Each structure stands twice: as C-alpha cells, then as structure tokens.
Amino acid sequence: QDSYAYTEAEATGSIGLPSQTPETFAPLQPIRMAKKHVYLLLGGIESWDGWATSAGMFGLQSSLAVLPDVEVTTYEWASFKKVLDDIALLPKDDIVIVIGYSGGGAKATWVANGYFGGSYPKDALPRPRIDLMILYDPSPTWSMMPIQDNVKRAICYRNITPLFFGLGGGVLVGNNTQIDTIDIFEHHWLVQMDSTLHQRTIKEVKNVQRLGDGYAAQ
C-alpha cells in the first residue's frame, strides 16, 4: 500500500542551504565621502609679497579649514601652474574650489583655462573641472581670461572703485557657465578684509556640489 504521509526527512532533505564562507560575513567597505579642496591664490605686486600684502585672506583660510571635509591649500599667484598640477591628482569625485584675490584672482582664470604661458590654446593643458570659483577684486584687468563650461559656477566680487593706481576692478566673463557678479565699492587693499564677503564665500563653500562629467573638457 502506497503511503503519502509527510516525513521530516523528506522536507529537510529537499532544501539545499548555500555554503557559508568567511567572505559571507566580510564587513562592508566604508563609503568614501567626497572632500572639498580649496585652492587659495594670494595677491601681491611681486607674488612672493602676497604672504604679507594679502594677510586678510588668511582669516578666510582659517574659517574654511575648520569646516568638515574641507582642505585648504594656499599659493602665491605665480605658483598657479602648481594649482593645475595639484588638481590633476585629485580623486575624480572630490570637489574643486578655486579662490583668488587680486593677482590671484586673475591667475585663477588662467588655471580654469589650463593656461600657463606660451601660445593659447596650443600650449595649454586640459581645462580642469572646477565646481566653484570665487574671485576677490581680480587684477589686473588685462590679465583676465574668459572661463568655460568646465567651471560649474563662479562668483566675482567686482570692485567699481578700487582706487589703487589702476589695479583692481577685474571683470569675469565666460561661456556656457554661471557667473554671479557682486559689485563692491571699496579700496582694493580693503577687499581682502571684508568680513561680509568672507561670510558669503564660506556659505558658498558649504553649499557647493560637484560638477557632473558632461562638460566639454579640452
């Protein structure tokens, strides 16, 4: 007589459990958070003197350095090629912020164009991705270069009355990028000490997001 009674052996024998290995319980790798890298270019007549003549920017440097996941590196404006080299070494997901005062502001536009001298664009390096650029009264006006879509967003504190022997008053222009121009009216020397501008800059650094990879880098 056939029997169709349920048996424990039949039930348990029909289920195959996956073998467990040490890898099964391996800890998950921590997710790396994108870091914000601020490249701060000082002013100065001869570049090297910017450590003294741009002292007001060191207050901004200190305020930015204490923000979470923010790293600040400061350069003389003549070292702008080093900024290009340092940006090229970053992890692709990190956030790039370039800030420049006076001559450092003008040279920041060179950084954005991959330009370091010679014939442009023939001798230029590939344009770096820049998520945020902030220029404090860039100078001289004739040294400014238009920026392109590799810069996600830029802010220029344009000085209408720099009163500094023809220096200051640089205007930032560009193609296929967002530029916010904030007009100011103060002596060129005092711009670096303007706490209102610094507070705005700090807020922008806190809020900046990464530029996507769809820009036409050249």
Residue spans for each PLM region:
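Active-site catalytic motif of lipid deacylating hydrolases and related acyltransferases
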Residues: A5-G16, P22-D94, H187
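Short amphipathic alpha-helical surface micro-motifs
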Residues: S19-E23, Y136-S139
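Serine-dependent carboxylesterase/thioesterase catalytic core
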Residues: V38, L64, L84-V171
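Hydrophobic, Leu/Ile/Phe/Ala-enriched alpha-helical segments that form helix-helix packing faces
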Residues: L60-P68, I87, Y115, S119, ...
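Surface-exposed patches in mature extracellular/periplasmic domains of secreted proteins
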Residues: V70-W77, Y120-L125, D213-A217
